[in-house]
Amino acid sequence: MEDSYKDRTSLMKGAKDIAREVKKQTVKKVNQAVDRAQDEYTQRSYSRFQDEEDDDDYYPAGETYNGEANDDEGSSEATEGHDEDDEIYEGEYQGIPSMNQAKDSIVSVGQPKGDEYKDRRELESERRADEEELAQQYELIIQECGHGRFQWALFFVLGMALMADGVEVFVVGFVLPSAETDLCIPNSGSGWLGSIVYLGMMVGAFFWGGLADKVGRKQSLLICMSVNGFFAFLSSFVQGYGFFLFCRLLSGFGIGGAIPTVFSYFAEVLAREKRGEHLSWLCMFWMIGGIYASAMAWAIIPHYGWSFSMGSAYQFHSWRVFVIVCALPCVSSVVALTFMPESPRFLLEVGKHDEAWMILKLIHDTNMRARGQPEKVFTVNKIKTPKQIDELIEIESDTGTWYRRCFVRIRTELYGIWLTFMRCFNYPVRDNTIKLTIVWFTLSFGYYGLSVWFPDVIKPLQSDEYALLTRNVERDKYANFTINFTMENQIHTGMEYDNGRFIGVKFKSVTFKDSVFKSCTFEDVTSVNTYFKNCTFIDTVFDNTDFEPYKFIDSEFKNCSFFHNKTGCQITFDDDYSAYWIYFVNFLGTLAVLPGNIVSALLMDRIGRLTMLGGSMVLSGISCFFLWFGTSESMMIGMLCLYNGLTISAWNSLDVVTVELYPTDRRATGFGFLNALCKAAAVLGNLIFGSLVSITKSIPILLASTVLVCGGLVGLCLPDTRTQVLM
């Protein structure tokens, strides 16, 4: 009986020893596999695995193996029958430990403290170390994925969004004269349209940039572009000026998020050697947006025949068609963006390892198939993710209803955006943020300020040239005639019109002096900058015309009738004769950016971002002095093209530097803040330079030159990001 009991006891001990040994060997193999996966992209040595392949046991450093530890003679009677499953679990109550026990309980076995025992500073320090390791690994992964079809597809999708931003900036200036007059805007409120759009873009840049760091690049960009497209379309149909302002405000608010989100999104799928060049190529779409807006304005707005009316109150003029056409790039980008994935770098930053891995594999497979290498396997199996620091959200007890919960959620998100923004002024990016603030402000102030000043300087030159082309018709008689075409830039003096019919005529800059109209009919007539001075009308009928009393100067009416006069505000802005030239000059100025874009893209990675940034701003400041010698329209247009061509290189390099200087967790927020500052500087520049147009030419030139040169010198003090990985 005793022998059988001892045999069973020995058998049980032997089985436990075997199970314990198998467990240790399994742990060892799993640890080796995990270590190899983590070391694959961190360039660590694999020597620690070479001597462990055939080990009989796996022990922590500092412990030795005693071959008789499991023998009956070496075993303790006190531990006989003990099983590992019977041990007290961590977290069970084990009594209050002494001070010495507390010190030795965890640290003595060489295990790190749990996160629950660490303060926030320690956790953030560990997270920074994880982010540095992830940055190196992610760069190698992107290099393995290659640059190909996926990046080019995303390039064109994001390019459409950037094009929509460029269109939005130009739309304001092009529709401003027509919209203000068409919507019956008094002079006191005429400047609100331009300011309200920039205000919306300023707030939108800050909000959407911060949101992109919270919910993702793709989601933020989809929402902001949808807001822009919807309210841009809606603004083309509204009739009241207040509602029109509201629509343009929200349209600007939506498009404000395009630039910070687009550049952050695209930079995170580019390898280091491709980043500067391809971000510069992406900047070309902003220029394409300006060219598109200028060309459409040139082709659409001056054509007043492209309009219709529903009664006398609802007028749909050509500038509204222009607004609809300018919303098409935004709609196209929204549709295309739905087929693109989220930024994998953002997903890794927020701890979504599996989703990021799937997207990186998609990028790799897409590019390899395009290269004709579909059999090439994506070798990455594990990617480092930064330590996630939990943030507690306090939800009040009265948030039972859905709208209260929604309010708390919105308030929490806004508070999170604000905290991320404040971190842009923490170490190690605080100094860079201050320098970037100066560079963004000076470049925007000088660029947009002179952009307002140029057209106002050119306009008097255009007026003089237009006056030289005026056709003068004097002392002639016309009887039994019908005119149904456009009359433009003419002066009729001492004329007599008998039994004439003016049907559907567009009068543009036409003046009648000392003329007589007998038994004439004006039907469905539209006039712009047209006046009748000291004229006599006898038995004349006016049907559905826009001839307001102020257009008849010292004129006399005998037995005349007015029927169905057009009500509401008609397009009567005075300098319509220069509309073609204004759009054409803007078209040329935008087209001049093309050489600067090409040069900056080709040289960005060769001469460096800082050389490009500082050199372009200094050269732009110097080029302003040539404006003193501009005495003709063609010379001023040439100076405008030169200035725009030099400035665009500074804009491109500044975009690249800004993206590369901020880490992923605050990249879009920092970019959004700087872009919002850019819009504020643009408004300030418009106000200051606009007030100096009629005073002197020297002050705007000196101001712009000084600001640009100073900003360029500060830009040279920024750290060079050409060789660093994207944090």
Curated annotation (Swiss-Prot):
Q: Where is this region: Disordered?
A: 24-84, 109-128
The listed outcome for residue 563 to A is: No longer interacts with BoNT/A HC
Q: Which GO terms describe its biological process?
A: chemical synaptic transmission; neurotransmitter transport; regulation of synaptic vesicle exocytosis
GO CC annotations on file: dopaminergic synapse; plasma membrane; synaptic vesicle; synaptic vesicle membrane
Post-translational modification here is noted as: N-glycosylated. Upon expression in a kidney cell line the most abundant glycan on Asn-534 is GlcNAc(3)Hex(5), while on Asn-559 and Asn-565 the most abundant glycan is GlcNAc2Fuc1Man3GlcNAc3Gal3. Both Asn-559 and Asn-565 have a high degree of glycan heterogeneity.
Which of the residues bear the PTM Phosphothreonine? 79
**Which membrane topology describes this protein?**
Multi-pass membrane protein
Topological domain, Cytoplasmic: which ranges?
Answer: 1-154, 213-226, 270-280, 342-437, 600-609, 658-669, 720-727
Q: Which residues are glycosylated?
A: 480, 484, 534, 559, 565
One Pfam assignment: Sugar_tr
Q: Which residues lie on this side of the membrane: Extracellular?
A: 176-191, 248, 302-320, 459-578, 631-636, 691-698
Q: What ranges does the record give for the region (Microbial infection) C.botulinum neurotoxin type A-binding, renumbered to this chain?
A: 519-563
What SUPFAM superfamilies does UniProt report for this protein, alphabetically?
Answer: MFS general substrate transporter, Pentapeptide repeat-like
Per UniProt, subcellular location reads as: Cytoplasmic vesicle, Secretory vesicle, Synaptic vesicle membrane
Indicate, by first and last residue, each region the UniProt record lists as having compositional bias (Basic and acidic residues): 113-128
List the PROSITE patterns.
MFS
**Which GO MF terms are attached to this record?**
transmembrane transporter activity
Q: Which UniProt keywords apply?
A: Cytoplasmic vesicle, Glycoprotein, Membrane, Neurotransmitter transport, Phosphoprotein, Synapse, Transmembrane, Transmembrane helix, Transport
For the region Interaction with SYT1, give the residue spans. Answer: 1-57
User: Where the protein is mainly located, per its record?
Assistant: membrane
Under PANTHER family, the record lists: SYNAPTIC VESICLE GLYCOPROTEIN 2 (PTHR23511), SYNAPTIC VESICLE GLYCOPROTEIN 2C (PTHR23511:SF6)
Binding partners and assembly: Interacts with SYT1 in a calcium-dependent manner.
Q: Which family does it belong to?
A: Belongs to the major facilitator superfamily.
Q: What is this protein called?
A: Synaptic vesicle glycoprotein 2C
